[in-house]
């Protein structure tokens, strides 16, 4: 039945949900990649759709910006609608010199300055990691599509406009591939409620060089990332 944030019924969502931050990107994915897509959520404008990809039922829904927002939606999808796998498909910023604009990054793990997972984990550090099989399937899907995806750590920041520029030096030292705002929270929710999760990002801007994609590009041109996510679902079904 419907929750405070999702006005759908059991069965409206597939067991796998792709989740961009922007609900308009969710609409774009549904209209571009899914067949027979229908809207299953519109509460607070957080659009959700269910359709099929190569005959496989798949859903896509926005999760908003930041760990608090994505935690609400992922928790409700898992506990109230039976979702088993969540794939975040979003954008990230780069700090490493060899990571370039529009590179695809598969988030094997996610560091964070948020305290949300410490609250969940009795004030201890929780290793926020993606599901191994989902990582492997995404890597295999990328190879099959001819996309040279990078695999490694993300950093999920609580602040988009960070006052601590020195932290980027630390991220570079530790080899952080991308800075975003949700992966660590999604991995924590998935672990807490027995689901599986993965984050795939496209580099939308470079923090060092100040190169960036436009808002329109972020909504419509990150197709390699979406194809990797969708094809990885099909590979997972073969296991």
UniProtKB/Swiss-Prot annotation:
Descriptive protein name: Purine nucleoside phosphorylase DeoD-type
Quaternary structure and partners: Homohexamer; trimer of homodimers.
CDD domains: PNP_EcPNPI-like
Keyword Nucleotide-binding (UniProt): no
Active site: 205
GO biological process per UniProt: purine nucleoside catabolic process
UniProt: phosphate binding residues: 21, 25, 44, 88-91
Catalyses which reaction(s): a purine D-ribonucleoside + phosphate = a purine nucleobase + alpha-D-ribose 1-phosphate; a purine 2'-deoxy-D-ribonucleoside + phosphate = a purine nucleobase + 2-deoxy-alpha-D-ribose 1-phosphate
Organism in which the protein naturally occurs: Escherichia coli O127:H6 (strain E2348/69 / EPEC)
Pfam family, one: PNP_UDP_1
Alphabetized GO MF terms: purine-nucleoside phosphorylase activity
């Amino acid at each position: 039945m419907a929750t405070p944030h999702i006005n759908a019924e059991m069965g409206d969502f597939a067991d796998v949900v792709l989740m961009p931050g922007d609900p308009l990107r969710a609409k774009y994915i549904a209209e571009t990649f899914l067949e027979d897509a229908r809207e299953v959520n519109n509460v607070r404008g957080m659009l959700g759709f269910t359709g099929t990809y190569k005959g496989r039922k798949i859903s896509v829904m926005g999760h908003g910006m930041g760990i608090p927002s994505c935690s609400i939606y992922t928790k409700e999808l898992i506990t109230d609608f039976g979702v088993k796998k969540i794939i975040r498909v979003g954008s990230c910023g780069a700090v490493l010199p060899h990571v370039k604009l529009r590179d695809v990054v598969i988030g094997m793990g996610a560091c964070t300055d948020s305290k949300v997972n410490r609250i969940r984990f009795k004030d201890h550090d929780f290793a926020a990691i993606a599901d191994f099989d989902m990582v492997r399937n995404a890597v295999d899907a990328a190879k099959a599509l001819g996309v040279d995806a990078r695999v490694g750590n993300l950093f999920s920041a609580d602040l988009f406009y960070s006052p601590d520029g020195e932290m980027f030096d630390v991220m570079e030292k530790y080899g952080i591939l991308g800075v975003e705002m949700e992966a660590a929270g999604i991995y924590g929710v998935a672990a807490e409620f027995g689901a599986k999760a993965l984050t795939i990002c496209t580099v939308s801007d470079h923090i060092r060089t100040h190169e960036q994609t436009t808002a329109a590009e972020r909504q419509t041109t990150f197709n390699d990332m979406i194809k990797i996510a969708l094809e990885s679902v099909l590979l997972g079904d073969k296991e």
